[in-house]
Amino acid sequence: MQTCISKQKELTFDDIINYYSKGENQNKRIGLEYERISIDSKTFKQAKFESLFEIIKEFSKINGFELIYDNETIIGAKNNEGSSISLEPGGQFELSLAPKEKLYNVHFAAQNYISQIDYIAEKYGIKFFAIGNQPKTTFNEMEILNKRRYKIMAGYLPTIGRLAPVMMRETAGVQINLDYKNSVDAKRKIKAAILISPFLTGFFANSPFRENKLTKYKSIRALAWKYTGPDRCNLFYKGIIDYTYKNIYELYANYILDVPMIFISRENNYLELNGKITFRDFMKEGYKGLYATMEDYLVHQSLCFPDVRLKNCIEIRNHDSQNLDVAVGIGAIYKGLLYNDNAIDKILDYFAPLTSSDLEDYGFLAAKFGVNFNVEKLNTKAFEIVKKLLYLAQFNLEADEQKYLDWLIDLVNSKRCIADIILDGVKNNL
């Protein structure tokens, strides 16, 4: 890889803070990023990439999407309105929707695209499973998408997290994106989302199977993320919970700057770093004649994987994949909770006794038990907490959007999570 001879404008901390400031807006939109597991319908193993490429091409031709390549490899497609489809490392198929104000419009747009994708996929013998983990194929049997950053990540991440290969190749999730008005609003939303994250992780646990058999966990996906890398996953920016601070942009950026870098990209080439320096080091000193740019920072922060991530929106990422109705229901929960100041106040007050260490512990319990574990600090059970959250969210939704939570409320009233439905079905068929 050739290094740069002339130094570009030095990237400053203020540049990074300005990036987050430019994300501010007064909207109250819901963005949905929806991954599903790609399965060969005959073998129930990982789908072949060649078939997935054909699905992308055919879908793009119908909908006027532009194909996205990494060198010669198709990695996705996008339209000019902000929606896209893409492939994850193990062939997980992701639909990313442009954010919308109304949940109905999110649901309609997603259903329209998904029905097309599924129809095309049937011709290639492919099915997409809305679950959190590959049920049969394990990472050591799987191909990885021929995308250069994935190949580099696949080499580095297992050195810092023993389940990183599981996370990369086997898992699929639901991500909800929210707007923020300013740094204070972003801080409140992010903190509230983090405080409730282990309990919603448990409620939406949907990956009890791996290697074609039941595991001891209700969310293998959540467990895998716990062992992917403590310096870049889960709640690595603990200060948001454990001490008082003024500006969330500064707090978050400082944590991102201290995360080790995986690679630097220049002119379609990659220089592997594999954790040798942090981004703060790169900003101060450069590396082999290269100097930090804003694009470098954006790539670097995208390689940090907390459950709640700040970009030019707030990304909430801690849910196993679900059927579409449930995925939209997840969006409904956050719309009802985090676009209402009174609801945020109630969350911050109720969960105030919890520390970052508590949240980490409850995250492990959620992965194993779903919603059936004690929350001793709050003197209650996890399913009781989820029940409170769902009723609060439904109360704050518009009348025509409350229906998205009806079934979920029935489920939590039965003291069960999504995975329990699968497990009950297995027991009934024994």
Where in the sequence are the language-model features?
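C-terminal accessory/tail domains of diverse enzymes
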Residues: 1-91, 98, 184-189, 195, ...
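Anion (oxyanion) recognition and catalysis
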Residues: 30, 118-122
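Glycine-rich, histidine-containing beta strand-loop boundary motifs that form or position
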Residues: 97, 130-134, 180, 204
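Long, hydrophobic, well-ordered secondary-structure blocks that form the structural core
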Residues: 129-148, 194-200, 212-215
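Residues forming anionic-ligand binding surfaces in small-molecule and nucleic-acid pockets
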Residues: 85-101, 166-175
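Acidic, His- and aromatic-enriched active-site or binding-groove loops in soluble protein domains
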Residues: 146-167
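Carboxylate/His-rich catalytic cores and anion/metal-binding grooves
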Residues: 121-131
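Membrane helical hairpin/interfacial module
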Residues: 90, 97-98, 103-106, 110-115, ...
